[in-house]
C-alpha cells in the first residue's frame, strides 16, 4: 500500500504543529462558523489548531473570517475587523485559556504558516 501524498503532508504538518505547542485536531464544524455542511444532517469535519495559555483568563470571542478580516459573531468590539493575513482561515474562537483557528489545512500543505498562525493566536490573546 502506498501512502497518499496529501495524507502524508497533513500528518507531517500536524506533527510539526504539535512540536511547536499548537494543538491540531479535527472537529465537527460549529454552526456559527458557517462552514458548509457535509450533508443535510452532518456537519463537516474541520481542522482546529489551538494554543493553550496556562495563566490566561481570556474573554469569550467568536469570529468568522470574511475578506481577510474578523467578522465578530460574539465578543468584544476590539476584535472587530482585525486583519487576518493567513490563508484558508474560516473562523477563530477564544475562551478561558485557549485561542484557536478553524482552517482549511489544504490551503497550506507545506506548513509554511504555522509559526505565523501561532504568533497571530498569541497576539489576539494579548489584545
Regions found by a protein language model. Name each.
Residues 1-18:
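Transmembrane-cytosolic junction motif
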Residues 14-29:
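Membrane-cytosol interface motif
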Residues 27-120:
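Structured extramembrane domains adjacent to transmembrane segments
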Residues 121-126:
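A common structural junction motif
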Amino acid at each position: 500500500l502506498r501512502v497518499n501524498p496529501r495524507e502524508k503532508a497533513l500528518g507531517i504538518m500536524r506533527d510539526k504543529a504539535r512540536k511547536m505547542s499548537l494543538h491540531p485536531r479535527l472537529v465537527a464544524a460549529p454552526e456559527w462558523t458557517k462552514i458548509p455542511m457535509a450533508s443535510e444532517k452532518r456537519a463537516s469535519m474541520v481542522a482546529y489548531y489551538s494554543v493553550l495559555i496556562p495563566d490566561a483568563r481570556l474573554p469569550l470571542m467568536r469570529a468568522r473570517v470574511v475578506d481577510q478580516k474578523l467578522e465578530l459573531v460574539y465578543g468584544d468590539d476590539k476584535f472587530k475587523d482585525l486583519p487576518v493575513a493567513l490563508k484558508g482561515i474560516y473562523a477563530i474562537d477564544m475562551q478561558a485559556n485557549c485561542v484557536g483557528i478553524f482552517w482549511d489545512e489544504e490551503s497550506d500543505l507545506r506548513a509554511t504558516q504555522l509559526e505565523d498562525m501561532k504568533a497571530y493566536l498569541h497576539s489576539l490573546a494579548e489584545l
